[in-house]
Structure formats: structure tokens, C-alpha cells
A protein has these predicted regions:
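Long, ordered, amphipathic alpha-helical scaffolds
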Residues: 85-97, 113-115, 120, 128-133, ...
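Acidic Gly/Asp/Thr-rich repetitive segments characteristic of extracellular carbohydrate-active
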Residues: 91-156
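Extracellular beta-strand-rich solenoid/capping regions of secreted or surface-exposed proteins
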Residues: 132-152, 168-192, 201-218, 223-237, ...
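Extracellular beta-strand/beta-solenoid scaffold signature
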Residues: 172-181, 203-207, 224-233, 253-267, ...
């Protein structure tokens, strides 16, 4: 396909792209939506979404100025499945999945509506909710809230390009920006918000999620958000945040909010959450896991890159949390912190120049009196098979040695 671009782009008025399973006949080609084909400075790009794991072939047709067409097919392309693991996919959870508008094999659910959100269409995109056509990114989500369980049909919002605060029809959360809210606790939403390609982003706002079940965020960046990047605030379940780039937010009013508040915060009886394959860029307070919660809730963090973020990786109250295969890289304050009877299983992580890799309030490292953490009652950390390089302090129970 790249040869077609190089030879024909000067004479082409546009491109059409198709995809099929590699073993299928040519009449099985399915046309990609036009929005999935984009022109860049010196190349065109087409993305095929909603494919299950397997081998595929794409065909690109150039439409020339004289009306003729030239087509070329790719060699076999391998599609890998996402890593659907962690508490969002627990068999004991309410919905047993966090795949949103998708099936767990990576294909769109049968009755899913696809809504393309671009800088040009964020105010004008449409979807049918509870039998009525609704216009605008936030307005569609507001209608979904009003419908409650009357309309649980899946919605797949696909972000193309960089959508800024000025592009959006309105915000239902003055603190965060876009609000995704169910009508009552743990409402089945079946919503995916995903980016297309390598440059999808939102800038100047974040997301507030409340009363929602089965919601997925994936494959886009969140930049210069208002307060929190993604706030899972009240009575959510089966939420999956993955393959994201989260930068820091706007400066807040408190002394510890120079980089905004939380990047991904989880609180208010939100449970069965997985945060995975996320690149946290220089965050100040990365992930709060519990605020005024009094009952146990379940969260998994795996395969994340905490890239020179300062603290809260995560900062845990009450919850039971599995933290594995993460890269803690140059963290100025601390890595995992537990308080208020929380339990963390910290497994197979790599700590590089993380000042205090693991802390339980008023115990061990925190008891040294540096004032780096919390005065709340402590929690429990079980650490296994971690690698630690360049830490200032790491104290294990029943050990006379600390680093």
C-alpha cells in the first residue's frame, strides 16, 4: 500500500480502504469508514478498528482525477488482542467485562453505534438514544444518563485528531469537563471512548465518571486537564482505562496542584477497575485510590509506565489492589502508598530511582519522620519479585536492613 501512496498521491483525489481476513475471498472486503482515512503532511493513513485477533489484508484504492482507480493490497497483517485482565474482567464482578461497546474478542457489539468526535464534529456528531436523535458529544452522554436502563445499547466514541475544550458542545462537569454518568449506581452503560491512530488527544478537559458500569477508555492522550484527567468518582464498576497517554493538568489552587490534581482517581465506591498500559507523563499526583471510602473495593494496575511522576502510584485507602509489571521511573516522592487498612499486592515491578518505592503510613519509611506521606492508620503491602534500583529507603517487616 505504501507504494500506491508514493506513485499515485499527486494524481489522486482521495482514497478508499477495505479490510478482510487473510483467508477470506475478495468479496469479503469491508469498506472502512471515510473518517478512518486521514491525510498527513507527507502520507495518508488508514486504521481498521474492531478486528478480532488474527491475520488480515487491507486493500487501498486511489481515486484519480480522471475517474480511474488504482488498487493495491498489503501482505498479511497480524492483529493482536488487548490484554483483558485484572479486576475489571473478574467473573465475580457485576458485568464481568470492561470492554464497553466491544465484545471481549475485540469486535464491536452487534447493535453498537459509532460516533466520530473530531475538532470539527464534536458539536455536531449525532447518535440515537432512547429512540431520539441527539447532537453533540456531551449532549449524547447526557441523554444516555437520562435514559438509564431504558437504553443500554452500546456507544463507541472515536476521537480523531486533537479535540480541545472549545470544540465541545458543552461540559456537564465544571470541575473535570466531560461527564459520563449513569442514572443510578452501577448503571450498565456499554460505552467506549477511544482514539484513532497515534495522534488522538483531548486538551483542556478531562472526564468525570459516575454511576457507570462497563466503560472503556483507550488509545488517546489527555492533556492540560482541568482538575483530574479521568475521575472515577461515584459508584462505578467494570471500568477499563488502558493504552493511554496522560499528561499533567492545569495548575490548581492548592500548593500540591502545580501539575493539576489526579491523573486517574478512583473513589466513591468505584470497584472492579483495571488501569493498564498507561503512560503517565510527569504527573504530580498520579492515582488516588480511595478517598472517604469505608468498604473494600478492587483495583488492578498493570503494565503502566510512571514516567517521572511524583507520587500516588497509587495512594490507597481501604481497597484491595494488585499492582504488577509496572515501571516506576524517576519518581520524586513515593511509589505505592497504603493507609486505612488497605491491602496491596506489589508484584514484579521495576523501580528505577523511585525515592520511596513502597510506604505504609506511620510505619517503616514513613516513620522516619520525613513527612512524606500520611498520618492515617497504615495498610498492608505484600511485595514479591520486584526489582529496585536507586531507592532512598525501602524497609521490609522482620528485617534489620533497609536501603
Amino acid at each position: 500500500a505504501s507504494d500506491v501512496y508514493k506513485r499515485q498521491v499527486k494524481n489522486a483525489e482521495g482514497y478508499v480502504a477495505y479490510v478482510k481476513e487473510a483467508s477470506a475471498s475478495d468479496d469479503a472486503y469491508e469498506k472502512l469508514d471515510d473518517t478512518l482515512i486521514r491525510q498527513y503532511a507527507d502520507y495518508w493513513r488508514a486504521d481498521a478498528l474492531g478486528l478480532k485477533e488474527g491475520s488480515y489484508v487491507m486493500k487501498v484504492t486511489a481515486v484519480l482525477k480522471d475517474g480511474k482507480t488504482v488498487s493495491e493490497s498489503t501482505s498479511s497483517l497480524e492483529v493482536e488482542k488487548y490484554d483483558r485482565s485484572g479486576f475489571a474482567f473478574s467473573e465475580n464482578s457485576k458485568f464481568q467485562t470492561g470492554s464497553g461497546a466491544y465484545n471481549d474478542d475485540g469486535t464491536l457489539k452487534k447493535d453498537a453505534q459509532v460516533i466520530y468526535v473530531t475538532p470539527e464534529t464534536a458539536k455536531t456528531c449525532t447518535a440515537v438514544v432512547n429512540g431520539k436523535e441527539v447532537t453533540g458529544f456531551q449532549s449524547i452522554l447526557d441523554a444516555k444518563q437520562s435514559a438509564g436502563t431504558k437504553d443500554t445499547s452500546p456507544l463507541d466514541f472515536r476521537i480523531v485528531g486533537c479535540v480541545t475544550a472549545d470544540d465541545v458542545d458543552h461540559f456537564s462537569s465544571s470541575a473535570e469537563g466531560i461527564q459520563l454518568k449513569g442514572k443510578s449506581a452501577y448503571t450498565e452503560m456499554n460505552i467506549t471512548i477511544e482514539g484513532v491512530g497515534e495522534d488522538a488527544a483531548v486538551q483542556g478537559f478531562g472526564f468525570l465518571v459516575r454511576n457507570s458500569g462497563n466503560v472503556e477508555f483507550r488509545n488517546f492522550a489527555v492533556m492540560a486537564f482541568m482538575d483530574d484527567g479521568i475521575s472515577l468518582d461515584t459508584k462505578n464498576c467494570n471500568i477499563w482505562v488502558h493504552n493511554m497517554d496522560i499528561f499533567y493538568g492545569s495548575t490548581g489552587g492548592d500548593s500540591d496542584q502545580a501539575k493539576g490534581d489526579g491523573s486517574v482517581d478512583i473513589k466513591g465506591a468505584s470497584t472492579n477497575v483495571t488501569v493498564s498500559y498507561v503512560h503517565f507523563w510527569d504527573s504530580g499526583k498520579c492515582s488516588l485510590c480511595g478517598m472517604s471510602d469505608s468498604a473494600e473495593f478492587l483495583v488492578t494496575y498493570h503494565h503502566n509506565w510512571f514516567d517521572h511522576s511524583d507520587s500516588r502510584h497509587p495512594r490507597i485507602r481501604v481497597a484491595s489492589v494488585h499492582i504488577y509489571n509496572n515501571y516506576f521511573d524517576g519518581n520524586a516522592k513515593y511509589g505505592v502508598g497504603t493507609t486505612k487498612g488497605s491491602s496491596a499486592f506489589v508484584e514484579a515491578n521495576y523501580y528505577r530511582n523511585c525515592k520511596n518505592p513502597m510506604m505504609s503510613s506511620m510505619q517503616g519509611t514513613d516513620a522516619l519522620g520525613q513527612g512524606t506521606f500520611s498520618g492515617e492508620n497504615g495498610g498492608m503491602i505484600k511485595a514479591y519479585n520486584n526489582i529496585t534500583v536507586g531507592a532512598s529507603s525501602l524497609i521490609y517487616a522482620l528485617s534489620l536492613i533497609h536501603i
